[in-house]
Regions:
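Extended beta-strand/beta-hairpin segments
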Residues: 12, 161-166
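Hydrophobic ligand-binding cavity/cleft-lining segments
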Residues: 1-51, 173-176
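Short hydrophobic/aromatic-rich motifs at helix boundaries and adjacent loops
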Residues: 7, 17, 40-42, 67-70, ...
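Glycine-rich portal/gate segments that line the openings of hydrophobic small-molecule binding cavities
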Residues: 37, 47-94, 104-108, 143-162, ...
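Beta-strand/loop substructures that line and gate deep hydrophobic ligand-binding cavities in soluble
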Residues: 87-147, 154, 165
Length: 176
């Protein structure tokens, strides 16, 4: 089971988009196994290991070859879920997906990411973590979250599968 790092300060990044759909329709999409294959612009392959609500585990291989495992830890039926993502036993980040009804057939989909720099930047001297995090990682992760949610928005509203880099390239996860 993947664990959060101990004694690690997390940094939050979040993005929200309005989607022309009910929370039930959004939930059906975000809670189906291997959904990233249809909706994620940087996902080369999303493979389910097991799909059992808060015990779900899957793998994501990004377009640039990076492979991460997702361990779901909380499941809020019809509302969202929480997961840990990383390469091995220690998570690189904690992720919260949340659906909120706004108006008739308009809902908000949010993804909140808590990044653990001691894990993702461990190959760099600690003195550089602040600069790398604030000038590279956080801006790239903001773009990443926007692209991911736009992918789900497109799939939910039109039924059209998202293509590679559909909303722009992100060098942390894809190749041009």
């Amino acid at each position: 089971m993947m664990q959060k790092p101990t004694n690690s300060k997390g940094y939050n990044v979040e993005h929200t988009e309005y989607i022309e759909a009910s929370p039930e329709v959004i939930w059906k999409t975000i809670s189906m196994p291997e959904n990233l294959n249809r909706c994620h612009p940087f996902c080369k392959k999303n493979t389910m290991i097991k799909w059992e609500k808060e015990k779900s585990i899957d793998l994501i291989e990004y377009e640039n070859g990076l492979k991460l495992k997702r361990h779901f830890t909380k499941w809020f039926e019809g509302k969202g879920y929480e997961l840990l993502i990383g390469k091995s036993g220690t998570a690189s980040a904690q992720v919260l997906w949340d659906i909120e009804s706004k108006y008739d057939q308009i809902s908000a989909l949010s993804i909140q990411l808590e990044i653990y720099p001691e894990v993702i930047l461990k190959k760099y001297p600690k003195i550089f973590h602040f600069f790398i995090l604030n000038w590279y990682v956080i801006p790239k992760m903001k773009d990443y979250l926007q692209s991911v949610i736009l992918g789900f928005k497109q799939y939910i509203e039109s039924g059209k599968t998202v293509s590679k880099n559909e909303f722009g390239v992100n060098l942390m996860f894809s190749n041009p």
